[in-house]
């Protein structure tokens, strides 16, 4: 078969730069069972050759039937090969027509190439002159960009260090603040314990005072009883003296009666001496009996009176002595009790004075700690504001530097592209292949990059940034916490946790750009509660007059806006107690 007998098939296509008109010759020949078809160009520029070779077999020594079959197969193969050759010849003709069209296009391209070659030297020199300065400027800008990038890296590193330091300071302030809070809580607990102990001592002091009053009353009562006992003693002493006088009188009367009786006895004896003996004896006996009876009676009466007087006197004396001893004992006990109570009262008064002094010191220390805490809070807020301002400034600088760096990178990329294109153009000057396409690419790329560069420059140079900084300060518990940038309201805050502040007749003064000044006087008896805020709205700015939370300034419809605004709080004495400063700076590239 043709597939088994075909040994080789070869196509060769060669391209040369010289293009000339050519003629095509189509030949067909048969030699020893081989077919050859070729296209020969007059100039030898393009050659298309197809070679088909077939082997022949010896037919000697075979039978007639086999030779007839072989001849038939050979003829069928020959017819098939003829048809294939016809198809191949048709395809070759189509290829030749296509080659003619391509040669026509090549002639046009050769003309364009000649035209470009005529302009090559002029355009190359102009491009070289045009881009030499740009390349030099680009290299300089690249160097400047690298130097500025290094400076930016140094600034960023320094700002990172500053940020780390501020973070450490913030953590330190936070730690100290927590420590101060713990100390304040401890002092508050100590104050509460001291106050409870003080209340207990005051109750004890009141109890001792009442006990002292009761003892003073008992002492006065006992003193009155003692005075009464002394008066009774004096009366009893006078009575004893009176009774002694009576006894003396009775003794004298008894002595007088005894003398009278003796006189009477003598007289009776004289009478008896004159009377008869019996009568004298009788009267003598009777008289002796009567005298003895009278004497016995008087002795009994005197003895009984004496015993009664002595017993009554001893009883009264013992009663008076017992009362006096009892009064002395009670008086000494009361004196000791009063002395002890006075000592206790003195000790309690000393302890009370010490506790009051300690309480005053603790309250003063708590007040100082509150002031220090407020100062630390203000310093912390100022540090936070400074940090925020620094971060905003750093972000703005970074954004500006990034924009400049992006512009430099865009310029560098544009210059790198132009350098690459310029290098290709210089390299293509020798080969002169595709010059027109490269020139068109240069023109299009340059126009596109110039447009992009213009947009980038417009974006960078059209950027305007606004930086606003706030600064607050206060000399007490009231601060100006917020000032609306649009001039709607001003907010005052009492930072103390337990102390109210009277802001009556205080003045708010707002100075705009060192020109206009707005002054508002707070109504009398306006009290800002501890830990609360007060908003003062301008007229028609949405505020409702609800003291002390919100006030409305009817004198102005705005607090004013400006680039440099200073708001101050001034008390009745004209002292500045708080300030709020707002500065706005606009920067543009």
Curated annotation (Swiss-Prot):
Location of the region described as Coil 1B in the Swiss-Prot/TrEMBL record: 131-268
Keyword Endoplasmic reticulum part of the UniProt annotation: no
Subcellular location as annotated: Cytoplasm
Annotated region (Disordered), positions in chain: 446-470
Start and end residues of each IF rod domain: 81-433
Primary subcellular site in the record, as a coarse category: cytoplasm
Protein name: Intermediate filament protein B
Organism: Ascaris suum (Pig roundworm)
Residue ranges annotated for the LTD domain, each copy included: 466-584
Region (Coil 2): 286-433
Region Head: start-end pairs: 1-84
Tissue expression pattern: Giant body muscle cells.
Biological-process GO terms, alphabetical: heterochromatin formation; nuclear envelope organization; nuclear migration; nuclear pore localization; protein localization to nuclear envelope
Classification of source organism: Eukaryota, Metazoa, Ecdysozoa, Nematoda, Chromadorea
Domain of life according to the entry: Eukaryota
Family: Belongs to the intermediate filament family.
């Amino acid at each position: 078969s043709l597939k088994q007998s075909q040994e080789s098939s070869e196509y060769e296509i060669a391209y040369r730069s010289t293009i000339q008109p050519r003629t095509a010759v189509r030949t067909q020949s048969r030699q020893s069972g081989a077919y050859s078809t070729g296209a020969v160009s007059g100039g030898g520029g393009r050659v298309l050759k197809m070679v088909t070779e077939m082997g022949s077999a010896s037919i000697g020594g075979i039978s007639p039937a086999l030779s007839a079959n072989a001849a038939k197969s050979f003829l069928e193969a020959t017819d098939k090969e003829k048809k294939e050759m016809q198809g191949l010849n048709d395809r070759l003709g189509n290829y030749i027509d296509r080659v003619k069209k391509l040669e026509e296009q090549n002639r046009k391209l050769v003309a364009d190439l000649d035209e470009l070659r005529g302009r090559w030297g002029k355009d190359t020199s102009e491009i070289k002159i045009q881009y030499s300065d740009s390349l030099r400027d680009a290299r300089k800008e690249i160097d400047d960009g690298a130097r500025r990038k290094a400076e930016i890296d140094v600034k960023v590193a320094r700002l990172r260090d500053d940020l780390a330091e501020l973070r450490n300071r913030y953590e330190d302030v936070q730690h100290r603040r927590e420590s101060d809070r713990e100390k304040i809580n401890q002092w508050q607990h100590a104050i509460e314990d001291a106050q409870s102990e003080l209340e207990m001592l005051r109750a004890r002091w009141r109890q001792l005072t009442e006990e002292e009053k009761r003892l003073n009353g008992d002492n006065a009562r006992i003193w009155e009883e003692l005075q009464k006992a002394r008066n009774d003693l004096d009366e009893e002493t006078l009575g004893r003296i009176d009774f002694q006088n009576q006894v003396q009188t009775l003794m004298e009367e008894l002595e007088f009666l005894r003398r009278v009786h003796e006189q009477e006895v003598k007289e009776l004896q004289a009478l008896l001496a004159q009377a008869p003996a019996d009568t004298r004896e009788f009267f003598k006996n009777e008289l002796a009996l009567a005298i003895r009876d009278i004497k016995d009676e008087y002795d009994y009466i005197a003895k009984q009176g004496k015993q009664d007087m002595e017993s009554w006197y001893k009883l009264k004396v013992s009663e008076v002595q017992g009362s006096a001893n009892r009064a002395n004992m009670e008086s000494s006990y009361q004196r000791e009790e009063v002395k002890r109570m006075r000592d206790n009262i003195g000790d309690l008064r000393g302890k009370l004075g010490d506790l009051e002094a300690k309480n005053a010191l603790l309250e003063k220390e708590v007040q100082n700690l509150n002031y220090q805490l407020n100062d630390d809070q203000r310093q912390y807020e100022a540090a936070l504001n400074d940090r925020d301002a620094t971060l905003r400034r750093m972000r703005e600088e970074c954004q500006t530097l990034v924009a400049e760096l992006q512009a430099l990178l865009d310029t560098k990329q544009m210059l790198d592209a132009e350098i690459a294109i310029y290098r290709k153009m210089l390299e293509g000057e020798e080969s002169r292949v595709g010059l027109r396409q490269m020139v068109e690419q240069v023109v299009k790329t340059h126009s596109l990059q110039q447009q992009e560069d213009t947009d980038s420059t417009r974006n960078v140079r059209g950027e305007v940034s606004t930086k606003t900084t706030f600064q607050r300060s206060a000399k007490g518990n009231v601060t100006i916490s917020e000032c609306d940038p649009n001039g709607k309201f001003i907010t005052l805050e009492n930072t103390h946790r337990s102390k109210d502040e009277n802001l009556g007749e205080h003045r708010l003064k707002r100075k705009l750009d060192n020109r206009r000044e707005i002054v508002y006087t707070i109504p009398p008896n306006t009290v800002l509660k501890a830990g609360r805020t007060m908003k003062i709205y301008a007229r028609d700015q949405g505020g409702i007059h609800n003291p002390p939370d919100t006030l409305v300034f009817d004198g102005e419809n705005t607090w004013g806006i400006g680039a440099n605004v200073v708001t101050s709080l001034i008390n009745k004495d004209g002292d500045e107690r708080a300030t709020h400063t707002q500065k706005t700076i606009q920067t543009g590239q």
